[in-house]
């Protein structure tokens, strides 16, 4: 071992003094013991508080294969455990003592890095399995044993994912788990019968609490269940059949990647364990060589790069360029492409799989050797870093003492020597990574005309010198471009961008000008682009992105030229520039039904307990998806109806996630309302009104939401801080509103308007389903019934969904006097026109003026309210287009009229979308849409005149 540096010698002297103060002046520590104690505050603190652990270390020093005895050692500790509180304490103390032993052996070089990873994984598996088995017996005593239809007892199987599954867990880590049970059935032999899903859900909840909950003794592991089917919104535990259905029908590529390392905890070789393995294997490894995965892997590469930029991970040895994540990624590339045909590539552990990659000739021997050496180097460094304070971090320290600890632990004389070796390893990884999934975009700088654009940027050209580059523009347009360039240079000079930033900008601008100058709209495009660049010019990373990825620059120019809204959005939130890297997804947004899955994957990178990061990530996801939708709109890939569909499904996915987050927060604080033990779902639903309810959201639409609950009055929550059940739901709704409206650096999520609830702003924020029905039957105004035409459940359990649909149908189908209805609808429209109507006669307000969109909506609402009593099927849809279709189908309105109104409606909405992209108001010249407006006026006179 190297001698201790000056900083570590000082630390060692302080430790001797501390131990003598707490354990007596005769307390003696050997030089080896001081080495370890000086390298880790965690070990030092633990041995001070538990001196008997030091005695055990001296009597029984750690050995490499002692992980095989963990289960027996822990079982001895659990013999005296009588309740869950004692269980939690025993698990936490066992973890801490064992981590001290692992850190001890690691610091003294008594175990290799691979052996250390195996010990850490074995410790986690032992704690998980022992806690599960103890709690399973306890739950069986309470509720009986879960059995299938034949009376065979059913176990809880646990899949360890990620590094835990691969036997490569780091020192201070989350654990990713998935719970499953073989078959449905009921419990037998208990005081009350439960179905198996309920039993295993409760067992899973208790297991998570036993491992995850912070107590005076700390926690065992942070448990992350988000890799399970449907993530947070899915059931905690699923049967084998449900798992198989999900992965066969809905499993995504990224879930295949996650499943590569999945391993059953407990090493079971029983029939149920083998059945689960067989169920999952076809999903993970395809029988053919799967080159289709390359594009998905390119997307993942982009995600890694974006992660580094988003979180400023320059010194991160896991996620930074050439870090641990890239080594894992390289190995998985070959597993996923060829694993179905090459059994040697189906292993969970990285190094043996990497060795197999080399033996199959898929990487050069020197590449495999370099990658293996880099992996072991980085994993040892990661573990030493985390062992300092038992903290989950992969960021190199700024603190001089911690730097000295790592240099000594890695066998280097000083910090700079360690950094030199680290840089060598990470560059070797990055070279293989880039070679494997490269981006071969041509370099604009190779264009023979490049020097002209270089001069345009660097030199103060005259208008006549610009003419050869822009022969299609007139003199005024050229003068405008030269002014824009000069003003941009002047503004940049006032910013502090440093020599590196200046160099990158000087590379970027000729490339940008080479693409902008040939455009017909060059002056406008250049103005928008320079305004955007000015907002990011001090953030060199983004300038480098545009230099490195020619395609990204091209897409940026195209989108900014087409839409000032997009340009301004990119200026405000430069993170969105990352979206330009993937043209395949930029102009083709995800399938409307895939937003939930995409959002779930996006949020997996964010710690569940970090609210600030989750709020930020939600906003970033929304902005990125809206950019894609706008790009599809601009390119013509998405017609207006599809634009609104995408914006609506995006909002619904976000509503799901926000309600889930609010629910998790409330349950952690108060527990769940007790009546949920007797019913499916959560007793809570969100109704979408207006544009959300009608699948007609625009780019800047707010959300009209109403909350309803199903909870008997006497119910309380089951947490330590128990509150009234209905109070729980009120706070849940308030929490939802808060999560939507909180302003982060990425702005708010959506403006939410809850004033359409019963009694409006004066009413309760959340209503019981009975109160909602009573209000609609007895107190609601006609305009509130009009609003109900465009209402639907956008989030909620099936029972409330069904109840709301019944209420809505009954209200809309009430017999109404047509003359009275006409008068009330006309009066409401007149009020709106007086309040919101356009006062400029030379302009036409597409939405609010006579013959516009609101008139069309009122005609649709009048027809539903007036004729649904005779034809209840008119209540089926909440969007205007399909309402007019129903009117024609059921002979309420002539087909030609319905088609004409639909055409007018879609055409005007299309114009509003495009005006929004141009950041224009919804007012246009009074002569436009003359035919459409005439049709709307005629229909208004016919039905409501």
Curated annotation (Swiss-Prot):
A GO term for molecular function: magnesium ion binding
Cofactor: Mg(2+)
Keyword Kinase: no
Entry-linked InterPro entries: GlnE (IPR023057), GlnE_rpt_dom (IPR005190), NT_sf (IPR043519), PII_UdlTrfase/GS_AdlTrfase (IPR013546)
CDD domains: NT_GlnE_GlnD_like (cd05401)
One Gene Ontology term from the biological process aspect of the record: regulation of glutamine family amino acid metabolic process
Coiled-coil residue windows: none
Reaction(s) the record says it catalyses: [glutamine synthetase]-O(4)-(5'-adenylyl)-L-tyrosine + phosphate = [glutamine synthetase]-L-tyrosine + ADP; [glutamine synthetase]-L-tyrosine + ATP = [glutamine synthetase]-O(4)-(5'-adenylyl)-L-tyrosine + diphosphate
GO cellular component: cytosol
Record key words, sorted: ATP-binding, Magnesium, Multifunctional enzyme, Nucleotide-binding, Nucleotidyltransferase, Transferase
Matching Pfam families: GlnD_UR_UTase, GlnE
Source organism superkingdom: Bacteria
Region of interest (Adenylyl transferase), residue spans: 450-945
Entry EC no(s): 2.7.7.89, 2.7.7.42
Region described as Adenylyl removase: 1-441
General function of this protein: Involved in the regulation of glutamine synthetase GlnA, a key enzyme in the process to assimilate ammonia. When cellular nitrogen levels are high, the C-terminal adenylyl transferase (AT) inactivates GlnA by covalent transfer of an adenylyl group from ATP to specific tyrosine residue of GlnA, thus reducing its activity. Conversely, when nitrogen levels are low, the N-terminal adenylyl removase (AR) activates GlnA by removing the adenylyl group by phosphorolysis, increasing its activity.
Family listed: Belongs to the GlnE family.
The protein, known as: Bifunctional glutamine synthetase adenylyltransferase/adenylyl-removing enzyme
Species this protein is from: Serratia proteamaculans (strain 568)
């Amino acid at each position: 071992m190297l001698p201790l540096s000056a900083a570590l010698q000082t630390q060692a002297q302080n430790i001797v003094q501390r131990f003598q103060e707490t354990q007596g002046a005769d307390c003696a520590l050997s030089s080896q013991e001081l080495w370890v104690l000086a390298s880790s505050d965690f070990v030092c603190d633990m041995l001070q508080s538990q001196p008997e652990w030091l005695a055990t270390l001296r009597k029984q020093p750690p050995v490499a294969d002692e992980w095989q005895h963990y289960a027996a050692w822990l079982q001895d500790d659990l013999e005296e455990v009588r309740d869950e509180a004692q269980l939690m304490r025993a698990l936490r103390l066992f973890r801490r003592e064992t981590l001290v032993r692992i850190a001890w052996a690691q610091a003294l070089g008594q175990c290799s890095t691979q052996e250390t990873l195996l010990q850490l994984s074995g410790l986690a598996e032992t704690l998980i399995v022992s806690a599960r088995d103890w709690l399973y017996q306890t739950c069986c005593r309470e509720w009986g044993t879960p059995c299938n239809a034949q009376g065979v007892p059913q176990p809880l199987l646990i899949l360890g994912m990620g590094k835990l599954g691969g036997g490569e867990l780091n020192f201070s880590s989350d654990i990713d788990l998935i719970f499953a049970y073989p078959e449905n059935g009921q419990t037998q032999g208990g005081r009350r019968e439960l179905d198996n899903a309920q039993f295993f859900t409760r067992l899973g909840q208790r297991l998570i609490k036993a491992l995850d909950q912070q107590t005076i003794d700390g926690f065992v592991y942070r448990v992350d269940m988000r890799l399970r089917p449907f993530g947070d919104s899915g059931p905690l535990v699923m049967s084998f059949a449900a798992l198989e259905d999900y992965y066969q029908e809905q499993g995504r590529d990224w879930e295949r990647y996650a499943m590569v390392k999945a391993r059953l905890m407990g090493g079971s070789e029983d029939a149920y364990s083998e059945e689960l393995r067989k169920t999952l294997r076809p999903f993970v490894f395809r029988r053919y060589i799967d080159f289709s995965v390359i594009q998905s892997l390119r997307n993942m590469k982009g995600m890694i790069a974006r992660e580094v930029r988003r979180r400023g991970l320059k010194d991160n040895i896991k996620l930074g360029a050439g870090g641990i994540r890239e080594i894992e990624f390289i190995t998985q590339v070959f597993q996923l492409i060829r694993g179905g045909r090459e059994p040697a590539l189906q292993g969970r552990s990285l190094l043996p799989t990497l060795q197999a990659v080399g033996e199959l000739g898929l990487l050069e021997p020197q590449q495999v050797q370099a990658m293996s050496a880099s992996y072991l180097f980085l994993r040892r460094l990661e573990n030493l870093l985390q062992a300092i304070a038992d903290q989950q971090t992969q960021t190199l320290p700024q603190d001089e003492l911690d730097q000295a600890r790592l240099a000594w632990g890695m066998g280097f004389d000083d910090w700079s020597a360690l950094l030199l070796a680290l840089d060598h390893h990470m560059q070797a990884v990055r070279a293989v990574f880039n070679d494997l999934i490269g981006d071969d975009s041509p370099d604009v700088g190779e264009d023979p005309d490049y020097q002209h654009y270089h001069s345009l940027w660097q030199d103060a050209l005259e208008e006549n010198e610009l003419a050869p580059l822009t022969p299609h523009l007139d003199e005024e347009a050229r003068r405008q471009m030269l002014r824009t360039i000069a003003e941009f240079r002047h503004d940049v000079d006032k910013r502090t961008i440093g020599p590196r930033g200046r160099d990158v900008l000087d590379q970027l601008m000729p490339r940008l000008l080479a693409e902008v100058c040939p455009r017909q709209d060059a002056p406008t495009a250049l103005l928008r682009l320079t305004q955007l660049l000015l907002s990011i010019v001090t953030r060199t990373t983004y300038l480098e992105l545009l230099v490195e990825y020619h395609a990204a620059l091209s897409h940026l120019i195209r989108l900014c030229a087409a839409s000032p809204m997009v340009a301004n959005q990119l200026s405000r939130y430069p993170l969105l520039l990352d979206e330009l890297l993937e043209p395949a997804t930029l102009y083709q947004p995800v399938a409307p039904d895939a937003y939930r899955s995409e959002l779930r994957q996006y949020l997996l990178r964010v710690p569940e307990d970090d609210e600030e990061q989750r709020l930020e990530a939600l906003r970033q996801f929304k902005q990125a998806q809206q950019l894609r939708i706008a790009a599809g709109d601009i390119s013509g890939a998405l017609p207006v109806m599809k634009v609104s569909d995408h914006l609506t499904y995006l909002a619904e996915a976000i509503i799901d996630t926000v309600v889930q987050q609010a629910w998790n927060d409330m349950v952690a604080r108060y527990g769940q309302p007790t009546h949920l033990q007797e019913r499916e779902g959560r007793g809570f639903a969100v109704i979408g009104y207006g544009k959300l309810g009608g699948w007609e959201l625009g780019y800047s639409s707010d959300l009209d939401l109403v909350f309803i609950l199903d909870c008997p009055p006497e119910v309380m929550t089951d947490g330590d801080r128990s509150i009234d059940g209905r109070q729980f739901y009120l706070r849940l709704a308030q929490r939802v509103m808060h999560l939507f409206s909180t302003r982060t650096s990425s702005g708010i999520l959506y403006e939410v308007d809850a004033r359409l609830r019963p009694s409006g702003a004066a009413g309760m924020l959340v209503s019981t389903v009975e109160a909602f029905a009573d209000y609609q039957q007895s107190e609601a105004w006609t305009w509130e019934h009009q609003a109900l035409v465009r209402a639907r459940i956008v989030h909620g359990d099936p029972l409330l969904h069904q109840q709301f649909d019944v209420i809505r149908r009954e209200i809309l189908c009430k017999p109404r006097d047509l003359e009275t209805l006409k008068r009330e609808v006309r009066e409401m429209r007149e009020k709106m026109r007086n309040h919101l109507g356009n006062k400029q006669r030379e302009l036409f307000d597409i939405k609010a003026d006579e013959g516009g969109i609101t008139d069309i909506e009122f005609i649709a609402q009048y027809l539903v309210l007036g004729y649904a009593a005779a034809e209840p099927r008119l209540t089926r849809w909440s969007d205007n287009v399909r309402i007019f279709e129903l009117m024609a189908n059921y002979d309420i309105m002539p087909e030609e009229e319905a088609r004409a109104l639909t055409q007018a409606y879609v055409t005007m909405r299309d114009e509003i979308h495009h005006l929004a992209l141009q950041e224009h108001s919804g007012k246009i010249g009074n002569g436009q849409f003359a035919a459409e407006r005439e049709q709307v006026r005629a229909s208004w006179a016919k039905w409501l005149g």
